[in-house]
């Protein structure tokens, strides 16, 4: 299952910003970029009354 690990790139090395659950030597793929920008294409505009109705049905 994919994991999102925030990291900083310094001196040619990606440094995770939190503890990671990986084995020593495990290979990973890094996708650089802003997650918000990538997810924006999946966003759908919905009227506030539809959102309110949805929320009330879930309660």
UniProtKB/Swiss-Prot annotation:
Presence of the UniProt keyword Aminoacyl-tRNA synthetase in the record: no
UniProt xrefs under Pfam families: AF2212-like (PF01954)
Keywords linked to the UniProt accession: Toxin-antitoxin system
Domain of life: Archaea
Database matches in SUPFAM superfamilies: AF2212/PG0164-like
Presence of the UniProt keyword Flavoprotein in the record: no
Coiled coil: none
InterPro entries, per the entry: AF2212-like, AF2212-like_dom_sf
Record function comment: Possibly the antitoxin component of a type II toxin-antitoxin (TA) system.
Family of this protein: Belongs to the UPF0165 family.
Name of the protein described by the UniProt record: Putative antitoxin AF_1090
Source organism: Archaeoglobus fulgidus (strain ATCC 49558 / DSM 4304 / JCM 9628 / NBRC 100126 / VC-16)
Species classification: Archaea, Methanobacteriati, Methanobacteriota, Archaeoglobi, Archaeoglobales
